[in-house]
């Protein structure tokens, strides 16, 4: 019972901490005349993936590598199948040409990078499947390239609506930042400890908890944002949230975690990694062929069903 309480309290602290940290950092940056464009592409983008980053890094430091990797892989699968799926059921999603030809292929590339880095035994580059520091640095290099690309295309669309930033006094900005960081760190420890204890009490591997419970919990901000956007007749926001979050999760969150400490895959198998690649390809083909550049309600229902099938597989394999 206490482990569930730790899990819920930890998740609450992570989500609120990410919100306070993002608001404080954005307001402070604005006071130093940093443009809304730069703030949106860096601080706000970081804030939405702060739960995944916190959980994965704390898990890596605690020696729970399967929880760290499972969180990223599971979150990315959840993002595509459930967030896009549910949003499309609420309102069909129109995909821009740039997203279909550039951003989604980048997400597919991130899956391929993880597959290659995680298959040391098959590729005969090692005796154990592990994401080592070299793999982590490679992912961080890809993240730097992605960030540069994001800035480049953003400057070509400077007329588009930019993030609204609530003005705060300097001392309040600092209070938000420090308080947010404390909440993230403390909440991350509670969440990871609670998750690990639940795994032990149920007799299942941390990989399963990471791929399911932890992944769903850390993806709640993106789900809430996307559904609200769909209800306000702006479902296209979901695609941007999902693609940006998935790229951030693989290239930065997983890259940073593996750089801090090598991550053995353990219970994370090629089935999970190939499923992530498959659903990323599904997102591309759904927007490319069935109804050009649109995710329909039918496709949304299929995506939700595909997620249920994946969860069913994980339960069956216990």
Language-model region placement:
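Hydrophobic alpha-helical segments, chiefly the membrane-spanning helices
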Residues: 1-318
């Amino acid at each position: 019972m206490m482990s569930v309480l730790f899990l819920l309290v930890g998740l609450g602290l992570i989500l609120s901490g990410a919100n306070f940290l993002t608001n404080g950092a954005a307001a402070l940056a604005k006071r130093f005349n940093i443009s809304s464009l730069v703030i949106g592409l860096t601080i706000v983008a970081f804030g939405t993936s702060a739960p995944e980053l916190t959980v994965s890094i704390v898990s890596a430091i605690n020696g729970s590598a399967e929880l760290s990797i499972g969180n990223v892989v599971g979150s990315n699968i959840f993002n595509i199948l459930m967030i896009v799926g549910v949003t499309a059921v609420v309102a069909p999603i129109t995909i821009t040409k740039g997203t279909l030809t550039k951003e989604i292929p980048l997400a597919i590339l991130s899956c391929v990078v993880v597959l290659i880095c995680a298959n040391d035994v098959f590729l005969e580059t090692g005796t154990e499947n592990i994401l080592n520091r070299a793999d982590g640095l490679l992912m961080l290099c890809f993240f730097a390239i992605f960030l540069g690309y994001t800035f480049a295309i953003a400057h070509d669309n400077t007329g588009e609506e930019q993030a609204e930033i609530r003005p705060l006094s300097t001392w309040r900005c600092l209070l938000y930042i420090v308080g947010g960081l404390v909440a993230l760190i403390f909440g991350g420890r509670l969440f990871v400890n609670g998750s690990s204890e639940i795994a032990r009490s149920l007799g299942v591997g941390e990989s399963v908890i990471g791929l399911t419970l932890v992944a769903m919990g850390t993806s709640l901000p993106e789900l809430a944002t996307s559904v609200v956007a769909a209800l306000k007749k702006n479902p296209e926001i979901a695609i941007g949230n999902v693609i940006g979050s998935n790229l951030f999760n693989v290239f930065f969150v997983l890259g940073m975690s593996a750089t801090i400490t090598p991550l053995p895959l353990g219970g994370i198998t090629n089935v999970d990694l190939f499923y992530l690649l498959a659903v990323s390809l599904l997102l591309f083909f759904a927007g490319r062929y069935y109804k050009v550049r649109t995710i329909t309600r039918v496709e949304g229902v299929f995506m939700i069903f595909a997620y249920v099938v994946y969860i069913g597989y994980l339960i069956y394999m216990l």
